[in-house]
Amino acid sequence: MTAIQLIVGLGNPGPEYEQTRHNAGALFVERLASAQRVSLTADKKYFGLTAKFSHQGNDVRLLIPTTYMNRSGQSVAALANFFRIKPEAILVAHDELDLPPGVAKLKRGGGHGGHNGLRDIIAQLGNQNDFHRLRLGIGHPGDAKLVSNFVLGRAPRAEQEKLDASIDFALGVMPDVLAGDFAKAMRELHCQKA
């Protein structure tokens, strides 16, 4: 079992994107930083906001890229390469169109599923896709032509409450994730639904 050394929250920078569906991953990392009582600070070297905490004697780094979504890999690769963090020790939290609001799922490896942030991370890590993902359901607008406006839009209150609940569920399994016990974390998380 590989312990997680880097947790990345995907989103777009700037106040106009803060509360959008596409920033679900960044919201997760902000909440995790708060729970760990650490502050995210800008670090130009890694093109993002970073923080560090210790879990069972291991350093865990948090990262929210301040690049736009489609350049997230630049930030992830800069930090992972500097600290020699292998893809299997990385967890990327991101919005997931294929899951309804209120559902969060863990997954290891796989393709990008059309997600530009994941696409760039895979490319910047040398086409290695063996990192873990925390998929935070945001639902789908029903028509592929509506996806861009949908992900860049703000969720109605009921949807946002479900997303917040799924983030709470995910935070609850983080001790198992950080220890590398993904099987236990998946069993617990995949039974939850807001």
UniProtKB/Swiss-Prot annotation:
The keyword Transferase does not apply. It is found in: Cytoplasm. It comes from Pseudomonas entomophila (strain L48). GO terms for molecular function: peptidyl-tRNA hydrolase activity; tRNA binding. TRNA binds at Y17, Y68, N70, N116. Its EC number is 3.1.1.29. The gene is pth. This is Peptidyl-tRNA hydrolase. GO terms for cellular component: cytoplasm. It is an enzyme of class 3 (hydrolase). It catalyses: an N-acyl-L-alpha-aminoacyl-tRNA + H2O = an N-acyl-L-amino acid + a tRNA + H(+).
